Amino acid sequence: MKQYIKLIKKIIRVGNQKKDRTGTGTLSIFGYNMKFDLKKGFPLLTTKKCHIASIIYELLWFLKGDTNISYLNENKISIWNNWANESGDVGPIYGKQWRNWSTPEGHEIDQIKNVLIQLKKNPDSRRMLVSSWNVGDIDKMRLPPCHVLFQFYVFNNTLSCQLYQRSCDVFLGLPFNIASYSILIHMIAQQCDLKVGDFLWTGGDVHLYNNHIELAKKQILRIPRTLPKLTILKKPQSLFQYCFEDFKIIGYHPYPAIKGEISI
């Protein structure tokens, strides 16, 4: 993924040194775009090994509408443990907003299901968006959403998606985000009998934490390898019935992992 390496190099070259909520400090740029053609391979980072199980289980967790980490922990995924309360809840984050957005009238809106309906009945719609940024719920969230809004687009029976990410931890978070939304595009395309197109990513505050800069410099010395391919082994009756075993990553040959500390 040469685009990812190019982004790291730009942050190191022209980034602004900023303070942040965690106290770690960041090297930051504002506004950045990348585009991945999913027909040319699955954009899973090869310059360091990514934990595929965490990416897939987290996405399935979001799609369940779940906001308790028990499902993740049962599957040996700990990426949300630092933000959960004593009962394992992380507040009304992604899953809640995607599947059960609360209205002032007391109703709940399933944004994902609504998008699926539009994709099948009116694929030219410009209203196929999902938002995680529910202003009325922000103070109840243990960690407000970083990837906040995504929109689908269909042309020539091909599905594309654009994501806006307000805050992006480039070293630890971004590789997960790119892979996760690319998997989601594959899943929805399969459910709607569409081909996969492009994943477009837009970042707002795009940053390297100060304690990741030297790790990132090590990573950019590695030459990106051929992207793997994602295969979905079966087609469930519903988007919400996929399980971890349905996904197979073929030809993933990354460099060794580079571990970095997470800023909380």
From Swiss-Prot:
DUMP binds at residues 21, 126-127, 166-169, 177, 207-209. It catalyses: dUMP + (6R)-5,10-methylene-5,6,7,8-tetrahydrofolate = 7,8-dihydrofolate + dTMP. The keyword Ubl conjugation does not apply. GO terms for biological process: dTMP biosynthetic process; dTTP biosynthetic process; methylation. GO terms for molecular function: thymidylate synthase activity. It comes from the Bacteria. One of its GO terms (cellular component) is cytosol. PROSITE patterns: THYMIDYLATE_SYNTHASE. InterPro entries: Thymidate_synth/dCMP_Mease, Thymidate_synth/dCMP_Mease_dom, Thymidate_synth/dCMP_Mease_sf, Thymidylate_synthase, Thymidylate_synthase_AS. It is found in: Cytoplasm. Pathway: Pyrimidine metabolism; dTTP biosynthesis. The keyword Transferase applies. Keywords: Cytoplasm, Methyltransferase, Nucleotide biosynthesis, Transferase. The active site is at 146 (nucleophile). (6R)-5,10-methylene-5,6,7,8-tetrahydrofolate binds at residues 51, 169, 263. Its EC number is 2.1.1.45. Catalyzes the reductive methylation of 2'-deoxyuridine-5'-monophosphate (dUMP) to 2'-deoxythymidine-5'-monophosphate (dTMP) while utilizing 5,10-methylenetetrahydrofolate (mTHF) as the methyl donor and reductant in the reaction, yielding dihydrofolate (DHF) as a by-product. This enzymatic reaction provides an intracellular de novo source of dTMP, an essential precursor for DNA biosynthesis. Homodimer. Belongs to the thymidylate synthase family. Bacterial-type ThyA subfamily. This is Thymidylate synthase. It comes from Buchnera aphidicola subsp. Acyrthosiphon pisum (strain APS) (Acyrthosiphon pisum symbiotic bacterium).
